[in-house]
From Swiss-Prot:
Highest rank taxon of the organism: Eukaryota
Membrane topology: Multi-pass membrane protein
GN (gene name): SLC35A5
Species this chain originates from: Bos taurus
Function of the molecule: Probable UDP-sugar:UMP transmembrane antiporter involved in UDP-alpha-D-glucuronate/UDP-GlcA, UDP-GlcNAc/UDP-N-acetyl-alpha-D-glucosamine and UDP-N-acetyl-alpha-D-galactosamine/UDP-GalNAc transport from the cytosol to the lumen of the Golgi.
Subcellular localization, as worded in the UniProt entry: Golgi apparatus membrane
Protein name per its UniProtKB record: UDP-sugar transporter protein SLC35A5
Protein family membership: Belongs to the nucleotide-sugar transporter family. SLC35A subfamily.
């Protein structure tokens, strides 16, 4: 009985940490979407290379995690010795991190394209499609069971998104004319004047690379004209698949085997090493990027918003890593839906986003299907995520372990021998 006395306090502490982590993620995610939009110029294009934002944010995360990792490994000599003794198995385990790094690289790059064609509110609403992709990949990759109510809510969600898509008429030409943000965006640079003088003949060579030909896309997508499908809609569906795959694979390798007890900063150092590598290769391999960096430097075209975007993107990536390590993908998806509400509200107030009557009728269907999905989650798959959370938190923060009924009793009994607990998991 005495061993259970502290559990209510630990449960409150765990709930506080969970709430704080969710609030941080929502704030950073909302800020990131708004900063991407604010960092564009009057033509809704980017005067800087978007890849430079991703390179710098990955570098910020790598430096931060590497410094913390060195401090952690210094305190744990046995892990330090293990790292010195390399083997092929450890090398292949290290190379595993290249897969989510590449997927995150694609995900971060597509965001710039999406927000060139869609309002932030519409982009976030359509990104709810990630619930479907996450659920499917949960079932296939993580073998997670979904009950009938959850599948029904996913079907309602999908149909609501299709209806929402067919009922919106957002013109990409009108995007640059919203609000008052254009005048304060661009900070002209004094460098590379010669390079800039050649750009007008090439139709703004910096910004041109980051938009698609509208005429070419319209002829390609004419078959979808009856549902008013645009390039932004297709891109965001692709982004949902890529983002879901990245997060699920990342959660899998964060928690599988002995990775569960490894420091999250050591794990993230491996991930961000490949993130810097992939984004850096993109800068070097594209001739347009190479010429601009050679003549103007890597920070040409950046403004206050894009610089802030670098750090917000970095810390948002860190918050996602903490969610996947200590919670799970479904919590991440749920917090993304709260971000939807925040971005929609801000778009109405700042970007002069004026929802139609159809929007007000169909958007609640999206949010209600999300609510039904998450409300049915404890009834259908309670045991699996609960066990994962307990396993995950018990590997690092033993005092934050939580559970209900027999499950908690079973986990707290062998508390005198923590290592045997790990072996059974």
């Amino acid at each position: 009985m005495e061993s259970n006395c502290g559990h209510p306090m630990l449960s409150v502490s765990s709930a506080m940490y969970t709430f704080l982590l969710g609030a941080i993620f929502i704030t950073l995610s909302s800020s990131r979407i708004l900063l991407v939009k604010y960092s564009a110029n009057e033509e809704n294009k980017y005067d800087y290379l978007p890849t430079t934002v991703n390179v710098c944010s990955e570098l910020v995360k790598l430096v931060f995690c590497a410094l913390v990792s060195f401090w952690v490994l210094k305190k744990e000599d046995h892990q330090n010795r293990k790292l010195r003794c390399g083997s092929w198995k450890e090398f292949f385990n290290f190379m595993k991190w290249s897969i989510p790094a590449f997927l995150y690289f694609l995900d971060n790059l597509i965001v710039f394209y999406v927000l060139s064609y869609l309002q932030p509110a519409m982009a976030v609403i359509f990104s709810n499609f990630s619930i479907i992709t996450t659920a499917l990949l949960f079932r296939i990759v993580l073998k997670r069971h979904l009950n009938g109510i959850q599948w029904a809510s996913l079907l309602i969600l999908f149909l609501s998104i299709v209806a929402l898509t067919s009922g919106t008429e957002t013109s990409q030409h009108s995007l640059a004319g919203h609000g008052f943000h254009h005048d304060a965006l661009f900070s002209p640079s004094n460098s590379c004047l010669l390079f800039r003088s050649e750009c007008p003949r090439k139709d703004n060579c910096t910004a041109k690379e980051w938009t698609f030909s509208e005429a070419q896309w319209n002829t390609t997508a004419r078959v979808f004209s009856h549902i008013r499908l645009g390039l932004g809609h297709v891109l965001i569906i692709v982004q949902c698949f890529i983002s879901s795959m990245a997060n699920i694979y990342n959660e899998k390798i964060l928690k599988e085997g002995n990775q569960l007890t490894e420091s999250i900063f050591v794990q993230n150092s491996k991930l961000y090493f490949f993130g810097v590598l992939f984004n850096g290769l993109t800068l070097g391999l594209q001739s347009g990027n190479r010429d601009q960096i050679k003549n103007c430097g890597i920070f040409y075209g950046h403004n206050a918003f894009s610089v802030a975007l670098i750090f917000v993107t970095a810390f948002q990536g860190l918050s996602v890593a903490f969610i996947l390590k200590f919670l799970d993908n479904m919590f991440h998806v749920l917090m993304a839906q709260v971000t939807t509400v925040v971005i929609t509200t801000v778009s109405v107030l700042v970007f002069d986003f004026r929802p139609s009557l159809e929007f007000f009728l169909e958007a609640p269907s999206v949010l209600l299907s999300i609510l039904i999905y998450n409300a049915s989650n404890p009834q259908g798959v309670e045991n699996v995520p609960r066990k994962e959370r307990i396993r995950d938190l018990s590997g690092t923060l033993w005092e934050r372990s939580s559970g209900d009924g027999e499950e908690l009793e079973r986990l707290t009994k062998p508390k005198s021998d923590i290592e045997s607990d790990e072996d059974t998991f």
